[in-house]
A protein has these predicted regions:
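Short, helix-capping/interhelical loops that line the mouth of catalytic, cofactor-
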Residues: 2-32, 83-131, 138-151, 185-212
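A cross-kingdom marker of C-terminal helix-rich interaction/assembly modules
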Residues: 12-59, 89, 177
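Non-transmembrane, amphipathic alpha-helical segments
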Residues: 29, 33-36, 40, 66-73, ...
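Alpha-helical transition-metal enzyme core signature, strongest for iron centers
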Residues: 41-48, 74-88, 115-129, 165-176
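Helix-loop segments that flank and shape redox-cofactor active sites
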Residues: 47-73, 89-110, 147-157
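Substrate-binding/catalytic groove segments of enzymes
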Residues: 134-137, 172
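Short conserved catalytic/interaction loops centered on acidic-Pro-aromatic/His motifs
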Residues: 173-191
Length: 212
């Protein structure tokens, strides 16, 4: 069993430096950063749940093609954004060395056409985030493979890619906002805006100053 190191703070309080599954100990600062990234990731994915539970009223709304972005549907953007989270989490759930490619994705999945399937998929990813993130070092190295269209290999970290997955999802939520607008669907005012934008505006919405 892993032992837990306890650091004494100036105030006399104690803060555990918890070991990850591979034995690497996390400092207080790293634990805080991981908690913040986890909060952002789960909040962004929860926005998708809110969309599915409270904004969409039929499965057909998932598959209507945008007039402004040919080929785009709400369902496709939900699936694509979720893919980046699951690919990253699956990557760091395997033994090291970590190798990640965002180009290995599933298409035409049930969540693209079914609100219930999409809801289940998003809920599963939120649960996976909560299970995996606390046990991985923020600076855990991974090799990223990408097609740009040239084959590229570069070095990154788990923390950087977790941040990217959240920002990437917000980008796709903004496109969902456009498609929803075409269909006359009303969305929460914070849906599809970057966290930095919400913080700048001082909004009380999710990911604004009141939440971070």
């Amino acid at each position: 069993m892993q032992s837990t190191t306890v650091e004494r703070l100036p105030s006399g309080q104690s803060s555990a430096i918890l070991p990850t599954e591979n034995g690497t100990q996390l400092s207080r600062d790293e634990m805080k950063n991981l908690e913040q990234l986890l909060q952002v990731g789960t909040t962004i994915l929860s926005q998708a749940l809110d969309l599915l539970n409270n904004s969409l009223t039929s499965d057909d709304q998932l598959i209507i093609h945008s007039q402004y972005m040919p080929g785009s549907t709400i369902g496709k953007h939900l699936r694509h954004a979720r893919d980046h989270f699951t690919l990253l989490l699956d990557c760091v759930s395997r033994p090291r060395p970590y190798a990640l490619s965002y180009d290995v994705r599933s298409r035409n999945t049930p969540m693209e056409t079914s609100r219930e399937a999409a809801r289940t998929a998003i809920e599963d990813t939120i649960a996976q985030l909560k299970q995996v993130v606390p046990g991985v070092s923020l600076d855990a190295p991974l090799t990223l493979h990408a097609v740009t269209p040239y084959s590229q290999t570069m070095q990154s970290t788990f923390g950087r890619e977790l941040w990217f997955a959240g920002l990437h999802a917000v980008h796709h939520w903004s496109m969902i906002r456009v498609i929803a607008g075409e269909q006359g669907i009303q969305l929460d005012k914070s849906f599809g805006f970057a966290p930095s934008t919400l913080v700048h505006q001082g909004t009380e919405a999710s990911l604004g100053k009141a939440k971070i």
